Amino acid sequence: MHEKKNTAKRRSALRIMGSLIGLVKPLLHIMMAAIILGTMGYLCAIFLTILAGQVIVHGLLTGAAGTSLSVQNMWLVHTPVKTILTVMIVIAVLRGILHYAEQYCNHFIAFKLLAIIRHKVFAALRKLCPAKLEGRDKGNLISIITTDIELLEVFYAHTISPIAIAALTSLIMVCFIGRYHVLTGLLALTAYLTVSVVIPMWNGKRGSQKGMEFRTGFGELNSFVLDSLRGLDETIQYGQGEKRKEQMSGRSKELTSVQENLSRMEGSQRSVTNMVILLASFGMLALTIYLYTKGGIGFEGVLTCTIAMMGSFGPVVALSSLSNNLNQTLASGERVLSLLEEAPLVEEIPGDAASGGDHAFAGAEAQNVTFAYEDETILDQYSLKLEPGKITGIHGASGSGKSTILKLLMRFWDVQTGRVSVDGADVREIPTKYLRDMESYVTQETHLFHDSIANNIAIAKPGATREEIMEAAKKASIHDFIMTLPNGYDTEVGELGDTLSGGEKQRIGIARAFLHDASMILLDEPTSNLDSLNEGIILKSLKESAEEKTIVLVSHRVSTMNVADVVYEMENGRIS
């Protein structure tokens, strides 16, 4: 199957941010604390410079006899300089404490939420698999789970509270500067809005597409590297190393080109921001001097408004700078949200067990089943009856639909028409957990985790004793081999079980099925990688277990069918 390309309409930045902010709800009280602490911290930094200006005015008024300075709103005129300096020291210390506390709260929220999001993503993947994940680009999924989620730290630690802090601080400063004259307040408001809203929106609009291109390209590069590592032996064997190297170099250059474009946008945005700050600062100076000459404000207003304007851009500059990284962050957020919101093809049925209590397993049946992968019909009006206590063989060539019927019995997919029932009930009505407990499924390719052999077998039964694991391994004809290893059952199998042969991995998979001890065992080509001796041992174990279990044996080998009580021949999705 081929992965479908995502043709869904892109979300707006505000919609992405709204969805991400919605996840903060459990930690809203900490977010409010971060906003208050951050606002107070910035105000401390701003008023530190304003107080310094007041000291200058104070000195001019008290130490420059004969000066003709006009003072209208000198709020610290009667305060001793020593007191002002003491307040400045206290404010400077508070600034550091408040900034630390704000950052602590923000990062606590960020890392707590990243853990929650990872949990949600893995839960979503579990619901989507295998129907929605078969054929999906695994490198891109890894990129979403790792780097995309990690990038959300920028949003939660350095975006949400800075937006609120910038808004609150700007509002307070507009009121403070505006108390000298309405025009100074309007100029401050215009400058803050330009730096914190207009410039980021302009930069975000032109860079959002590039941000998504970079995150998608990064995921595709991850897939390519992963694919190259897995196929390293074949690459070397067929002399494709140079070609693979050129392909990787080409992909890296494309990604670098996108990153350079983003960097250029970042540079131009910084330049525009700095230009606006300079224009606003000198504009405030010019405006206050003009108002001073007209008697609109006093000299302290000229100095205080200019200093306040120059020193109060910190919160809005921080907000403006966010848009540089925000393009990639929001692209990552969109990819994560799309995965979380993707609807599974098969909805899980809640519950732990079917009603009716303990009873004898009633077998399984497929009745007039039609099933297709997208537009390719695999099963057409297919019927099959699996008697309890019997071994049923399904024989046919590759691509005839043998494996598909096992996946439908496991309810990895739902049928388009017809009915699949297990233990007398439609699989679409059986609680998913109970269905999984009733069935053991051994696939053609056994996946082994980077762990010990014992733990790989014990996946089928958490908490299994070593004796139970060994008994299952004996039935799967793998026990003797395991005992020849230096560490026996504690031997690490390596990544993807690369230290073991295909046949050894397959037998460990069969050992899992024996350990799971389910009422029905589904075996997809269980002996394809085995020699005739080991095939005979495993088939003998299956025959001995058949009286108490329902076994479905899928294979293209005629010899494997010899152990079956009933054999169905499959051809093009039909019984022949």
Annotate each predicted stretch with a short phrase.
Residues 1-45, 63-81, 102-106, 110, ...:
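Membrane-integrated ABC transporters
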Residues 237-240, 264, 305, 312-341:
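Cytosolic ends of transmembrane helices, especially the final helix of ABC transmembrane type-1 domains
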Residues 31-98, 178-183, 299:
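Transmembrane helix-loop-helix hairpins at lipid-water interfaces of multipass membrane proteins
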Residues 13, 45-53, 57, 87-134, ...:
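Juxtamembrane helix-loop junctions of ABC transporter transmembrane domains
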Residues 26, 30-41, 158-213, 286-297:
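Transmembrane helices of ABC transporter permease
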Residues 22-29, 127-131, 147-156, 160, ...:
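An intracellular "coupling" helix at the cytosolic face of ABC transporter transmembrane type-1 domains
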Residues 357-576:
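ABC-type nucleotide-binding domain
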Residues 84-95, 99, 192-194, 266-280, ...:
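Hydrophobic alpha-helical segments in the permease module
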